[in-house]
């Protein structure tokens, strides 16, 4: 069996969030339909710390992207969704329910959801996130 990538394991974890209406999360792809979700890796220096024994503390940063309906009233709902998602991630850390990445330390949101782009009827919101894990030498 082929081992899953770390970003795929992150996607699997996010798909367990009860706030997602259709439950399906893509990687580096978001549909133009509302209630579409994607995990989009962002380029960062992966090594946070190198240890004397050769082990390392590493990070993956990514955006959780949400395609949502866009209007004055919908924007209030979308803002609440982003806040609720942030709280869900926080609660998962508290109970140690994390992505199934070996050596994982945490997953967290680095900010609230903000609008990346809009059309007349939809908006893409992004929530910047980080996973930190340790790798032995």
Region annotations inferred by a language model:
Residues 1-25, 29-31, 43-137:
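Charged, amphipathic alpha-helical segments and their flanking helix caps
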Residues 34-38:
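Extended compositionally biased segments used for macromolecular assembly or nucleic-acid engagement
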